[in-house]
């Protein structure tokens, strides 16, 4: 029986993903425990287990939720719908992102890869686009204009900022690249894809 488990890079801590795990919150600890259980069950032959470490997915459709990363979709999704959105971290905050399409592509590849392609380690980091929250806001302005981008409220929240900055912004995804997986080109392309997949979202035309 094969099981593909989704996890995250949050348990790695703020250092590069090639370092030993240093989770800085309960979420990271729980993800790390889950990975080890899958690895142990695979070692014993109970399952054919694969841990896929997802990057923060943006832009997600739907409504805001209670996750610390929720604003990384909300600060784009809500303004495009004409709604205000809070951004609780400074513009220079670095983040590692992946579009929904790239994330799904990675999960499918993980499920279909042969044992020889996958290798002995059960866990793999999916590729990430490294960007900053400020660059995300700038991409929104390029896509939809200043009026839409002005719907972002820069409202600092130290608790959220402490969590987000404990996540790695630089990810070692060499194994994923060997499987043919690549990160998104830039955040402009992520917004363009979101608009294409959500035709009800119609931002004003911008000449900028």
Regions flagged by a language model, labelled:
Residues 103-107, 126, 136, 176, ...:
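Non-catalytic, hydrophobic alpha-helical segments
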Residues 2-17:
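N-terminal Rossmann NAD(P)H-binding glycine-rich loop of SDR-like oxidoreductase domains
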Residues 24, 55-69, 89-101:
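Glycine-rich "substrate-gating" loop/helix at the edge of Rossmann-like oxidoreductase active sites
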Residues 106-161, 201-206:
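Mid/C-terminal beta-alpha module of Rossmann-like enzyme folds, strongest
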Residues 35-61:
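Conserved beta-loop-beta element that borders a ligand/cofactor-binding pocket
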Residues 72-86, 94-123:
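Alpha-helical substrate-binding/gating segment
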Residues 2, 156, 168-178, 185-208:
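Amphipathic terminal alpha-helices
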Residues 30:
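Active-site helix of classical SDR
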